[in-house]
Amino acid sequence: MVSIEDVYHTAELAKIEITEEQAEKFRKEFETILDYFNILDEVEEDVEPTFHVLPLTNVFREDEPGECLKQEEALSNAKHKEEGYFKGPRVVE
């Protein structure tokens, strides 16, 4: 159980001034928060850990050489290009 003194002490540590009404409000809120921790204490801990809720399947394919665009074709629709390369905006000055 959280006491009013605990609330005032916490407020003092935080360097804030609170009224009696605020202290009572915070006391109730602190108790609610601590109740949530009590609920967490009841969670089973001896379960096998999972990394994902849904099963994941990697989809791999073999690398196969194929036809690719010529440089001129790849750059043909580029709005900004320079010396045979795509030109993007500067990100570091």
Swiss-Prot record:
This is Glutamyl-tRNA(Gln) amidotransferase subunit C. NCBIfam families: gatC. It is an enzyme of class 6 (ligase). It comes from Archaeoglobus fulgidus (strain ATCC 49558 / DSM 4304 / JCM 9628 / NBRC 100126 / VC-16). Gene3D superfamilies: Glu-tRNAGln amidotransferase C subunit, N-terminal domain. One of its GO terms (biological process) is regulation of translational fidelity. Heterotrimer of A, B and C subunits. SUPFAM superfamilies: Glu-tRNAGln amidotransferase C subunit.
